[in-house]
């Protein structure tokens, strides 16, 4: 497992109570803005090639939200034959569908060029949606660290004290082990499930991968990151989620 993921799991903890509420599988979970951008591949946008790239980018971004909705929450495409734009976008599966997904992507497509005004390679995360574009094809199986993470959120309301941490960790690990197999069997690359814990708590888990991501990578990261939840989760947090540009996990009690 790349060290960058372990570091993020330990140090990048953002309380969900600071974020705007929107619906999910259970009524007490919140998701919202994660101020995140990565700008790369800066160049001369005033050159002939840069001007053509910007034209292609505007066309790609203008149709991206509707393309994501038509494609069930995930999209990968390109625009242009020369100085082409290649991009992808994904909405988290527990966003209210389709309104929130579409409106958040509309905001992301409007802000991405402003956030990285001279970049040919841009990654943006906004309210449970991710958007990325490049000036060349990018294969999901390359060593692209931007596919890995941008945030870990903890849920702090309706807190419950779990006294048997070892049993909780094992139950949660077993749940995500199972979801790591189920998610790659789903055409939408989404899976969810429940596990009883101590006969008193129902543990809900959700796993999602970017649909064009290789299935072996999807299964690997769902399994491994799900297992690492126990290293950062205290016994008083009621839930946790892990967001990246290629996969998303969350668990909560209900």
PLM features: what roles do these ranges have?
Residues 2-254:
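Extracellular secretory-pathway ectodomains and N-terminal mature segments of eukaryotic proteins
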């Amino acid at each position: 497992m790349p060290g960058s993921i372990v570091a993020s799991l330990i140090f990048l903890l953002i309380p969900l109570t600071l974020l705007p509420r929107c619906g999910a599988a259970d009524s007490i979970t919140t998701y919202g803005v994660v101020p995140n951008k990565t700008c790369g591949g800066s160049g001369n946008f005033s050159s002939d090639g840069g001007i053509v790239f910007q034209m292609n980018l505007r066309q790609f971004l203008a149709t991206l939200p509707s393309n994501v909705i038509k494609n069930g929450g995930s999209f990968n495409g390109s625009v242009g034959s020369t100085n082409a734009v290649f991009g992808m976008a994904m909405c988290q599966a527990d966003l209210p569908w389709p309104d929130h997904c579409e409106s958040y992507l509309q905001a992301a497509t409007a802000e991405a060029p402003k956030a990285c005004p001279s970049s040919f390679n841009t990654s943006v995360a906004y309210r449970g949606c991710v958007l990325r574009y490049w000036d060349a094809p990018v294969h999901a199986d390359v060593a692209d660290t931007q596919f890995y993470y941008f945030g870990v959120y903890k849920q702090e309301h309706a807190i419950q004290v779990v006294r048997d941490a070892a049993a909780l960790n094992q139950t949660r690990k077993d749940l995500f082990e199972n979801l790591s197999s189920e998610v790659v069997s789903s055409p939408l690359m989404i899976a969810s499930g429940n596990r009883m814990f101590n006969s008193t708590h129902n543990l809900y888990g959700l796993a999602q991968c970017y649909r064009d991501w290789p299935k072996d990578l999807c299964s690997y990261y769902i399994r491994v990151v799900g297992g690492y939840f126990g290293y950062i989760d205290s016994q008083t947090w009621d839930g946790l989620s892990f967001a990246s540009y290629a996969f998303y996990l969350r668990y909560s009690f209900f």
